[in-house]
Each structure stands twice: as C-alpha cells, then as structure tokens.
Amino acid sequence: MLVFAGLGNPGKTYENTRHNVGFMTIDELSKEWNIPLDKTKFNGQYGIGFVSGKKVLLVKPLTYMNLSGECLRPLLDYYEIPVDNLKVIYDDLDLPTGRIRLRTKGSAGGHNGIKSTIQHLGTSEFNRIRIGIGRPVNGMKVVDYVLGAFTDEEEPAIKEAVRQSAKACEASLEKPFLEVMNEFNAKV
C-alpha cells in the first residue's frame, strides 16, 4: 500500500492557512481519486482506495503540525507499510510561493512537522513533496505568517502548486519517485 500524508493543522481556524497546503493536497487527491477520508484512527483522518490498480492510503494527521509523527508511525505499523511507500506533503518557507520541490531525504529544515515525522519514523529517508509558501516580510513573525491565510495575489499560485503536487503524487503511482522528482523539479 502507498501512503500520501499531507501535513497541517486540524479545524476550521487553520483550513486555508499557509501551513495547511499538505491538507489541501490530500483534499484534492481525495476528490480526484474518489477516496473519502472516512476513517479516524491513530490521531489521523484517512481513507483507503485503489488508483491505477494500486492500493492507496490518504491521511491528514489530526495531531497539529508539530506532532505529525505521532499519527504516521502507528498508521504505518498497523498496516505494515514500509517507510519507502510514504510520501509526505508539506509547506516550505524556503521555496517561493507556489513552487514545488520533491526530495527523497533530508533534514527537517526547521519544519517542526517534519522534525516530528523524522523522530517517530527513526529516519530522515522518506519521500517528500514540499510546497513553497515564501517567507514573511515587514518583520512579521514566522508563526503568524504560516498560520495566516494566503493573500489574493498568492491564491492562484498556491492552487496551481496544490494541483502540481497532486499530479506528482499521481505520477509516483506509475514511476519511481526519483524519476518523478527529476521531472517535477525541472519545471520552473
């Protein structure tokens, strides 16, 4: 089974914030693939279905961002899914708004959701899809920025980035992640 995990914060308050682009991508995949997120277990909301003949699990950890690993580790253990089958989708301050970047491993880069995931998985070697949200300007605190809504100017770029992230997830069903990474990272 392949797992696509979108990181974010639960609840209406955070629904359309920069920190929730991972959740937005999972919602997009849920619609496209007709996989309802109808299960709640392991501190996560998830659904299981078949896409292109492959069994797929979509999950949104409901632990709040900084504790995301507390959902992912037990979920992988319960379904006996190797870490190699996991793709984590999340926001990245170090990428320009709307840009996506795929990686096969790496540090948390200051992202607490990834830090928790690395800690609970016991490895930093898992596939990632990073969605750029840019950096705050005019002295705005990072926490206020990531928990803030996108501006009207940012909306189109973010919607396209979520679509591209979903396309990268879909491509990874048919091709090795490294090949998908090279393809999508080459796009400007």
Swiss-Prot record:
It holds the Pfam family Pept_tRNA_hydro. It comes from the Bacteria. Its main location: cytoplasm. Keywords: Cytoplasm, Hydrolase, RNA-binding, tRNA-binding. It catalyses: an N-acyl-L-alpha-aminoacyl-tRNA + H2O = an N-acyl-L-amino acid + a tRNA + H(+). It is an enzyme of class 3 (hydrolase). The active site is at residue 19. One of its GO terms (cellular component) is cytoplasm. The record marks 91 as: Stabilizes the basic form of H active site to accept a proton. InterPro entries: Pept_tRNA_hydro, Pept_tRNA_hydro_CS, Pept_tRNA_hydro_sf. The record marks 9 as: Discriminates between blocked and unblocked aminoacyl-tRNA. TRNA binds at residues 14, 64, 66, 112. One of its GO terms (biological process) is rescue of stalled ribosome. GO terms for molecular function: peptidyl-tRNA hydrolase activity; tRNA binding. Hydrolyzes ribosome-free peptidyl-tRNAs (with 1 or more amino acids incorporated), which drop off the ribosome during protein synthesis, or as a result of ribosome stalling. HAMAP family: Pept_tRNA_hydro_bact. Monomer. Belongs to the PTH family. This is Peptidyl-tRNA hydrolase. It comes from Bacillus licheniformis (strain ATCC 14580 / DSM 13 / JCM 2505 / CCUG 7422 / NBRC 12200 / NCIMB 9375 / NCTC 10341 / NRRL NRS-1264 / Gibson 46).
